[in-house]
Amino acid sequence: MLIIETLPLLRQHIRRLRQEGKRVALVPTMGNLHDGHMKLVDEAKARADVVIVSIFVNPMQFDRPDDLVRYPRTLQEDCEKLNKRKVDYVFAPAVEEIYPQGLEGQTYVDVPGLSTMLEGASRPGHFRGVSTIVSKLFNLIQPDIACFGEKDFQQLALIRKMVADMSYDIEIVGVPIIRAKDGLALSSRNGYLTAEQRKIAPGLHNVMNSIAEKLIAGNRELQEIIAIAEQELNEKGFRADDIQIRDADTLQELTETSKRAVILAAAWLGQARLIDNQSVTLAQ
């Protein structure tokens, strides 16, 4: 496994891979890797000849400076995990390598609508930062496929739209959420939880299951369903942030013709903002 930190060396290897006709898969990450990331790697390995994992804590997508400062940087441990998985390349650039002129005046990629709704409304600039760094990685690495987790449901939808709108010839693969045995979705931010909070954390998934059962039973009183769910979360020790029930295919409000719903939930538990989602097939 080769660790690459500079753009010239990356471009050199990408040119060689292209000349050799290799099928390249990209797994973009911010490091602090867990089993959910490893599932992305496994999916990439199954679909390509060469796997490149990027590790870059992207300052452009953080809406709070304190969150950027305390985000875990675990490059050595991450590389050890990826080496065991027989990843071919790790691209781990410094911020100055990606944004040599700094963020001030930086050209960015924005995806209208999807970047400012739902999660984007509560985290201004976040999705603009995501689409910009992913676009830069696509331009640098020129992958045939790229793997993203379905845990970040809106992010995946945003990347798919960006790829379509910008005519990237890249297959976007969504990989299902990996959960702990108690149902908690794996996330780098779970590390912020205390031992006591970790016991409470699966409650978010349990509340989403309750919402799903109501939708499957035909209940469409969405505001009431959401209000009850928020109350349940608060009673469990969470601070409910946002719960939405949307059309899973468009992320717009549910209509009578919607075939699938997605429950999008975000809640604070101590210093950790946990997000999760669940898709539900609706009775027609």
Swiss-Prot record:
Coiled coil: none annotated. The keyword Ligase applies. Beta-alanine binds at Q61. ATP binds at residues 30-37, 149-152, 178, 186-189. Pathway: Cofactor biosynthesis; (R)-pantothenate biosynthesis; (R)-pantothenate from (R)-pantoate and beta-alanine: step 1/1. GO terms for biological process: pantothenate biosynthetic process. Its EC number is 6.3.2.1. Keywords: ATP-binding, Cytoplasm, Ligase, Nucleotide-binding, Pantothenate biosynthesis. It catalyses: (R)-pantoate + beta-alanine + ATP = (R)-pantothenate + AMP + diphosphate + H(+). Signal peptide: none annotated. The reaction proceeds by a bi uni uni bi ping pong mechanism. Catalyzes the condensation of pantoate with beta-alanine in an ATP-dependent reaction via a pantoyl-adenylate intermediate. Homodimer. This is Pantothenate synthetase. It comes from Salmonella agona (strain SL483).
